[in-house]
């Protein structure tokens, strides 16, 4: 059972490597320039492969257009992949935008912003804590 999962992982890694090479060398569409294959998930029966791609540009319209180009070229990419891989079954390809990179950049920016606001806000918090302490003590006495 464990070997079956290892095989899908190996096939996925090989597909990732070959599709990255195909996109870089064989596909001449300018809308697909700077396309990166970030991951590949292959089903257990090797019938389907989900290819996660990222693009240099984060514009949503251009991402949709690039995904449409990849969907149209799926048959051609699959035939080139079939020539390069020695596999009995060549999986059907489905290209999906991998938003994890842009989400990671967004989260990092939010953390940096929070750290910067904490540094600026610490001095203000210290001043307010000193002013508020007598009123808290007077409330306890009542």
UniProtKB/Swiss-Prot annotation:
InterPro entries: KH_dom-like_a/b, RbfA, RbfA_dom_sf. Gene3D superfamilies: 3.30.300.20. Its main location: cytoplasm. GO terms for molecular function: ribosomal small subunit binding. It is found in: Cytoplasm. It holds the Pfam family RBFA. GO terms for cellular component: cytosol. One of its GO terms (biological process) is maturation of SSU-rRNA. Residues 118-142 are annotated as: Disordered. The keyword Lipoprotein does not apply. Keywords: Cytoplasm, Ribosome biogenesis. Residues 123-136 have a biased composition (Acidic residues). Belongs to the RbfA family. One of several proteins that assist in the late maturation steps of the functional core of the 30S ribosomal subunit. Associates with free 30S ribosomal subunits (but not with 30S subunits that are part of 70S ribosomes or polysomes). Required for efficient processing of 16S rRNA. May interact with the 5'-terminal helix region of 16S rRNA. Monomer. Binds 30S ribosomal subunits, but not 50S ribosomal subunits or 70S ribosomes. NCBIfam families: rbfA. This is Ribosome-binding factor A.
């Amino acid at each position: 059972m464990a070997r079956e999962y290892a095989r899908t992982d190996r096939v996925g890694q090989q597909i990732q490597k070959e599709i990255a090479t195909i996109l870089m060398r064989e596909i001449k569409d300018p809308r697909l320039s700077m396309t990166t294959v970030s991951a590949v998930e292959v089903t257990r029966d090797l019938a389907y492969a989900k290819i996660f791609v990222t693009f240099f540009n984060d514009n949503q319209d251009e991402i949709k257009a690039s995904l449409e180009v990849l969907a149209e070229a799926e048959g051609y990419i699959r035939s080139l992949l079939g020539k390069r891989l020695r596999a009995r079954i060549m999986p059907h390809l489905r290209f999906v935008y991998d938003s994890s990179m842009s989400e990671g950049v967004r989260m990092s920016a939010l953390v940096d912003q929070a750290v910067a606001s904490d540094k600026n806000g610490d001095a203000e918090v210290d001043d307010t804590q000193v002013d508020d302490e007598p009123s808290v003590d007077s409330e306890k006495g009542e």
